[in-house]
């Protein structure tokens, strides 16, 4: 009974609560970064230095009345935000920080598969809202996410060839001598840009272009359901950055200070997240055709070529004696 309680309730909660807290403060950090880049302060009234702002925002959203359009699909309209957040939090299960909650053999494939499922929550919410803006936003989001999934999958394949395993822990072992960022920097650059597109962030935020689509697929959402979408989006941003840190930014385990493993990984993920916000503050939005051309005409040929190269090189060298 106690073991079941620990494995099924306490362990997942020990993962979920810190992730949700991190998401709350990531929203505050985003507003602060954008504020300072626009030469203003950002939130600074609620609590010291505005630190209680995310809590106030969350409370405000959850006590608002969840208005539902009369023509929308009642079940799907409420089910999709829940699905989005559930998927976003489930994705954290195989993350080695430093130990995963479920030690999966195919952790990388699990992450790829579940992040593809997030498309259904976007599509469902856009369709269930019964609004033309929401539907256009959802269709854009689906096309964009599916397109960038292709390049993410191929980049992951290349990186797996480097490390020799689908478990996320093997990346720590493989990068003990050198960060994968050094030999695979073109892959790392394409991976980072693809994660920006995958999480619908600027300059790829076509799906929620305020100037053209009035907020995209979640235009009809208010209160609690909107807050769930919001939490899911930022949890995905943190997840993608944690994954980028695991894949490319070296082993999180420091032999001299093993207890700092989690701190090390969190610092790398936080720095990558700040770059996400920095990009948002700096770059204008892509045009939709440019967004699609980037992945299908630039990233796809490049990643395919690199996969072939990384497959061909070890095969060609396999017959050479080791002393050469």
Swiss-Prot record:
Keywords: Electron transport, Membrane, Mitochondrion, Mitochondrion inner membrane, NAD, Respiratory chain, Translocase, Transmembrane, Transmembrane helix, Transport, Ubiquinone. The keyword Electron transport applies. The chain crosses the membrane at residues 9-29, 43-63, 75-95, 106-126, 146-166, 177-197, 237-257, 259-279, 299-319. GO terms for biological process: aerobic respiration. One of its GO terms (molecular function) is NADH dehydrogenase (ubiquinone) activity. InterPro entries: NADH_UbQ_OxRdtase_su1/FPO (IPR001694), NADH_UbQ_OxRdtase_su1_CS (IPR018086). The keyword Electron transport applies. It comes from the Eukaryota. It is an enzyme of class 7 (translocase). It holds the Pfam family NADHdh. It is found in: Mitochondrion inner membrane. Its EC number is 7.1.1.2. It catalyses: a ubiquinone + NADH + 5 H(+)(in) = a ubiquinol + NAD(+) + 4 H(+)(out). GO terms for cellular component: mitochondrial inner membrane. It is a multi-pass membrane protein. Belongs to the complex I subunit 1 family. PANTHER family: NADH DEHYDROGENASE SUBUNIT 1 (PTHR11432), NADH-UBIQUINONE OXIDOREDUCTASE CHAIN 1 (PTHR11432:SF3). Core subunit of the mitochondrial membrane respiratory chain NADH dehydrogenase (Complex I) that is believed to belong to the minimal assembly required for catalysis. Complex I functions in the transfer of electrons from NADH to the respiratory chain. The immediate electron acceptor for the enzyme is believed to be ubiquinone. This is NADH-ubiquinone oxidoreductase chain 1. It comes from Salmo salar. The gene is MT-ND1.
């Amino acid at each position: 009974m106690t073991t079941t309680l620990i494995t099924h309730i306490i362990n997942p909660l020990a993962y979920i609560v810190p992730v949700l807290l991190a998401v709350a403060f990531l929203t505050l950090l985003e507003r602060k970064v954008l504020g300072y880049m626009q030469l203003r302060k950002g939130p600074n009234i609620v609590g010291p230095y505005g630190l209680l702002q995310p809590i106030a925002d969350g409370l405000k959203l959850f006590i608002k009345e969840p208005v539902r359009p009369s023509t929308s699909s009642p079940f799907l309209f409420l089910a999709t935000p829940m699905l989005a957040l559930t998927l976003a939090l489930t994705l954290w299960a195989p993350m080695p920080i430093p130990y995963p909650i479920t030690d999966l053999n195919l952790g990388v494939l699990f992450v790829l598969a579940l992040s593809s499922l997030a498309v259904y929550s976007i599509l469902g919410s856009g369709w269930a809202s019964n609004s033309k803006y929401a539907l256009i936003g959802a269709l854009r989001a689906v096309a964009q996410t599916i397109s960038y999934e292709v390049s993410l999958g191929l980049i992951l394949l290349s990186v797996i060839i480097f490390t020799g395993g689908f478990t996320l822990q093997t990346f720590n072992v493989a990068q003990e001598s050198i960060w994968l960022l050094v030999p695979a920097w073109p892959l790392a650059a394409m991976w980072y840009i693809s994660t920006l597109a995958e999480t619908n962030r600027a300059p790829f935020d076509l799906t929620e272009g305020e100037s053209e689509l009035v907020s995209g697929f979640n235009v009809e959402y208010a209160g609690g359901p909107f807050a769930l979408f919001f939490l899911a989006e930022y949890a995905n941003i943190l997840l993608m950055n944690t994954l980028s840190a695991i894949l490319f930014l070296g082993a999180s385990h420091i032999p001299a200070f093993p207890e700092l493993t989690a701190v090390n990984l969190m610092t790398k993920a936080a720095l990558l997240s700040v770059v996400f916000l920095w990009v948002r503050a700096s770059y204008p939005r892509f045009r939709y055709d440019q967004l699609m051309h980037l992945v299908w005409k630039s990233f796809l040929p490049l990643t395919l070529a690199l996969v072939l190269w990384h497959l061909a090189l070890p095969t060609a060298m396999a017959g050479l004696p080791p002393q050469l």
